[in-house]
């Protein structure tokens, strides 16, 4: 069954040529095509030359977006003793120990990110049914299993986010709001590109970068010139 495309999106698609755009031009076009009646996010969809069914070709890491995400996230922390108070002092929206684990097991999920200290992970791991489907399970690679709660809470509140390649080797990630300036979006997209290059899986073979598309939440896909995005001089511009 063919998916029906709205008249609005059809009109916006006419503005996008079938070619790869220089990064800044692509971002200006993203902003121009963000015409929905709500504040849209800027999305990146990056196809990599990896097969995540092999453990040495999986990508899961974090990026600190220099211009932030434009979103207010609710951070929950599971810890013990003084670490609970430390998390609250750092700005965690929710912090607790066994009682929070119990609440989550009963369906409480009123948060966007969960951080846990290593000593409680055996108990948190039992919440896989609740946390797994929503991508909320803490992980060392994602920077969400740590004793340094102050740093973790502050970084994620400031714009650090976790991302991973899906089972087809595509990274889907929000890198700001369409209302950001094109220069600020470029700074975030460049940070994302550098992080993906820095964390290239050891088992990745052949061409690593296959394609990069960006869009506003309800906008058309815009192809970005990969070589131009990866050019080190772009970071100096």
UniProtKB/Swiss-Prot annotation:
Pfam families reported in the protein's UniProt record: Ribosomal_L1
GO CC, alphabetical: large ribosomal subunit
Entry keywords, A to Z: Repressor, Ribonucleoprotein, Ribosomal protein, RNA-binding, rRNA-binding, Translation regulation, tRNA-binding
One GO BP annotation of this record: translation
Record InterPro entries: Ribosom_uL1_bac-type, Ribosomal_uL1, Ribosomal_uL1-like, Ribosomal_uL1/biogenesis, Ribosomal_uL1_3-a/b-sand, Ribosomal_uL1_CS
GO molecular function, one term: rRNA binding
Cross-referenced HAMAP family: Ribosomal_uL1_B
Function statement: Binds directly to 23S rRNA. The L1 stalk is quite mobile in the ribosome, and is involved in E site tRNA release.
Family note: Belongs to the universal ribosomal protein uL1 family.
Binding partners and assembly: Part of the 50S ribosomal subunit.
Name of this protein: Large ribosomal subunit protein uL1
